[in-house]
Amino acid sequence: MGNLFFYYFIQKIIMRCFIVSLLLLFCIGCTSNSGALFIKKTSDHTGIGFINKLTYTEEFNPYTYRNFYNGAGVAVGDVNNDGLLDLFFTGNIVGNKLYLNQGNFKFKDITVSAGVGCEEVWSSGSTFVDLNHDGFLDLYVCKSGKPGGAHRNNELFINNGDLTFTESSKAYGLDIIGLSVQAAFFDADRDGDL
């Protein structure tokens, strides 16, 4: 009986020492400064200067448009098949922007040359998708909000493969004039098309 108590007592001491040792190792590991998990990159370094700034006016504000703060979207995809992810930002009151990834967290604004800019129409969500199955990502942009009125149709930019796009929403029957927020594409009947 005495030996059993002794082994039980020793086992508890060993277990407590083990737990305390693990906690000490954990605390020491947490205090060592082995480098930052994230490094802040400025717009001067990245080349990304997009700001979706919302400005009130007497005619257009959260009281006259209830979805004023619904936000905008970001699409991430490789538009030129170079293995680097490019960025497309939609703007509500400001214009949309397409940034080509040049590597090492440096991007180039190619909005105008690519033909995907949109001014004065409230853009919300955006989706990169290879809609015509040519191996290049196309871009679908949803429109919402008050600005633009009847001209507020969603846009489909077909990738020409040379860093330019052609707006083709009407040809594909996707020039919707609703209050679209986001679009998702999938092959519902598994026939190979979206």
Functional labels for PLM-detected ranges:
Residues I19-I28:
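Bacterial N-terminal signal peptides
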Residues C30-L194:
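Acidic, glycine/proline-rich Ca2+-coordinating loop motifs
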Residues Y7-K12, L25:
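Low-complexity intrinsically disordered segments
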Residues N3-F9, A36, L98:
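Carboxylate-rich, polar loop motifs that coordinate divalent cations or form catalytic acidic clusters
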Residues M1-F5, D191-D193:
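Short intrinsically disordered, low-complexity coil segments enriched in acidic
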Residues G2-N3, Q11-F18:
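Positively charged n-region of N-terminal signal peptides that target proteins for export
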